[in-house]
């Protein structure tokens, strides 16, 4: 009975998300409540919801302050000199332009938002692509792959946040062992950028451009994309801001304090240092709070879903049925199986449907083989390079529309590179021990 009820709940939730009948926040909250009532768990729903919310509270705090932290630093222009330097270095060489596109996208992807990453990358680099005749699909693919690595693996990025919150994990436990894989993934994307750029160089050669022509259109487009006035920029504070970012990241890796506490401190310091005026502080907080609150609400809704799924024991029943069909000899490979199946699953499912609907079931099934939930969480993000090609991803639709290209053509161009990246980071995760084979 519980197995049927659990599968039905996950199916209904997935359909609601896929058909966009309701928002993810509504689906995550209403669906489990309705099915809990059907199963006769009405009296315990309140306690289950509260327990689920308590489980994800630290993840919600992490997201809130990380988004605000990076938002303030982007406003202050911390990354502007690097963007301008990239534009001046790449000149008319397709290889340098491709690598510069990847580096820029990785930098912007630190804020965890695909829309911001694509808007700034495309606006800064597209004029160069057009001027020398490079294929803009190269830029689109590299921006997508860069986003999948940086935003996909950092604990404040969308996929990792969902996995961490739904399984009630500590962000540091998730991220620190994954850091070598992330760095390897970054190196992989840069190497792929070199290959794509070399192919374009063989096609069109190196185009000689005057320096003043290189950055003119790009700088104007970049400024239009950021939509920030000069009064927000703090060029004199750039080294202090850079020191602040590096310090926060070092402390996160060392695990001295919970990341949510570190990002809270970092956000408050960044806000105070760059915008000591109270009025400007309120304006900056208001500017970024919309995106932050939306994500936090999503996390708390995930807590409701996970709390009821766990409290009613539906997840145990579903996991039991999965365990029964997996040969015991394959149990030790479960994290690898999750990593490989995440490639097709996350393409046909939205992140909400996959992480909130399927990952908890995988984690519970894996526990029967002595595999920790955190390994399943890490394994589940290996398919993100392919996921970001999906038409279900709003930022991908934005990307192809900005470049005035057809989504199908983009998918055909990018699929090879995306699959390669997913397989490479999966292999790196196995080698470095982020996911294990028992």
Swiss-Prot record:
It is found in: Cell membrane. Keywords: Cell membrane, Citrate utilization, Membrane, Symport, Transmembrane, Transmembrane helix, Transport. It comes from the Bacteria. One of its GO terms (biological process) is transmembrane transport. It is a multi-pass membrane protein. GO terms for molecular function: citrate transmembrane transporter activity; symporter activity; transmembrane transporter activity. InterPro entries: Cit_transptr-like_dom (IPR004680), Citrate_transporter (IPR014738). The keyword Membrane applies. GO terms for cellular component: plasma membrane. Pfam families: CitMHS. The chain crosses the membrane at residues 22-42, 59-79, 89-109, 137-157, 174-194, 237-257, 258-278, 292-312, 330-350, 356-376, 380-400, 418-438. Belongs to the CitM (TC 2.A.11) transporter family. NCBIfam families: citMHS (TIGR00784). Transports the free citrate anion. This is Uncharacterized transporter YraO. It comes from Bacillus subtilis (strain 168). The gene is yraO.
